[in-house]
Amino acid sequence: MSSDGEEGSFEGSQLVSQSPSINSQTYAIPIPEGMLDQLDISSSSSSAGGRDDEDEEDDDADVDVGVGSECLVGVTGQDRLIIGSGDDSDNGDGDEVHDNAHATSDVSSTAELNHVCSEETEDMDNVDEGLLDDIMNNTGGGGFVNGFEFHESEPMFDVSKYVFETLIQAINSADFSESLAFQTKTSAVINAKSLELKQLINMSKDRLVDLQDKFEKGVQTSNRIKRNLKMSREKIQFLNDEFRTNYPIEFNQARDKIIERTIDS
């Protein structure tokens, strides 16, 4: 009867360890069959035996597990109760056998549990370190430290930046030199044209002075000609008067000839 209870408790514990918890909705960590067997023996003996021994053994187990307790994080309270429940109805005849077996297997079960849990924690640490190394390698050595982003400076980036800055400076200097040359050329053309204008202005002034002199001389000449014409007219008038009075026949004949000559022409 006790063997049937042990097999039932073993199957129940194995089913619990390999199936997810309904209440917690988390998966339990798989535990070796030998350890499950020992845990089944210890749980059945503790549930049927004295309560004082069970409290002391639970305290010792909590102290001995220590670091390895992290491996039971996925096991919920209901799973532990199912694992530790066993087959209480079938434990009436084998209480003494279970008490004696528990005394010898308690130390070995806790040691094996600590060893397995320590190995699992080391594996998890190695996996975490590997993931961190992969992430650092994929990001190329860059990341965030205290909220600030840092990047490793690459030499090609510095060289390209220097080259581009040099090209920009050269372009700026070329533009400046081109503008300076254009300004110099423009100023030279303006100076040449201004010199030509000054020469033309001076020539115009000289010509105006000459024209003014000629005009003044022409005025004087015209005035002199007017005076001469006036004197000549006066003399002709005087001669006509004299010829008309003193020589009227000759004067009239001479006048008729002059009129006929003008008509024939």
Swiss-Prot record:
GO terms for cellular component: BLOC-1 complex; endosome. Residues 1-63, 79-111 are annotated as: Disordered. It holds the Pfam family KxDL. GO terms for biological process: endosome organization; regulation of protein localization. Residues 14-27, 102-111 have a biased composition (Polar residues). The keyword Transport applies. Component of the biogenesis of lysosome-related organelles complex-1 (BLOC-1) involved in endosomal cargo sorting. Belongs to the KXD1 family. Component of the biogenesis of lysosome-related organelles complex-1 (BLOC-1). This is Biogenesis of lysosome-related organelles complex 1 subunit KXD1. It comes from Vanderwaltozyma polyspora (strain ATCC 22028 / DSM 70294 / BCRC 21397 / CBS 2163 / NBRC 10782 / NRRL Y-8283 / UCD 57-17). The gene is KXD1.
